[in-house]
């Protein structure tokens, strides 16, 4: 299933199934299925993603971030794909996420108490990624 980003804030959801499963009429039913406005919003998102080459950008900026994060001392592991990145820290560094938020105004997710999850917008620039890295290094120091 997929949702959220499909409509860039407009409520929509979807499902994709493997070709080996043959859908039939009536197999899936939804309360709001076939909403024309939601479909138009999703189509507009796809058009912007293609026009602005957001997938290519996410791959390039994501690879840059992952490689640069791997160079920073104090990080246990960096894993991810594109701009979905997990930064695992030693358990004795509980304040990094708090420092990022309160000192640098950077909101991050959390996969576990010692794993910071990054999931920025697909149009994140290299410059913004560089700014994040500098702030992250400072947040690690306290």
What do the PLM-derived regions correspond to, one by one?
Residues 1-142:
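Conserved N-terminal phosphate-binding loop of PLP-dependent enzymes in the Aspartate aminotransferase
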